[in-house]
C-alpha cells in the first residue's frame, strides 16, 4: 500500500495528520511518500508514528516525483492543505485523492 502525502500550506495539528494517515493505512504495512518535505513541527511525530507502525517513510521533491505512474497497487493521495501539482497528477492518473484542510 502506498500513501502519497503533501503538507504544502497545511495549518493543522500533528494529531490530525497522524489520525488521517492511520485511517488510510488501517493497520497495514506500506510506504508513505512525502512530496515537498515535512514541516519541522510535524517531523518528529511523523517519524515516530512510521517506526511504530512499520511504515516506510520516503521524502522527495516535486521534480523527483514526476514518475508517479511507476507506483502500482493500492495508492491513496492525501493532500494536507493544497498542492496543485499533486492534485493535477492524481487527476491525470485517476488516483483516489483526499484534500484535508484544517485552519
What are these model-predicted stretches?
Residues 8-103:
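Acidic/glycine-enriched connector segments
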Residues 1-8:
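Short, hydrophobic/glycine-enriched beta-strand segments
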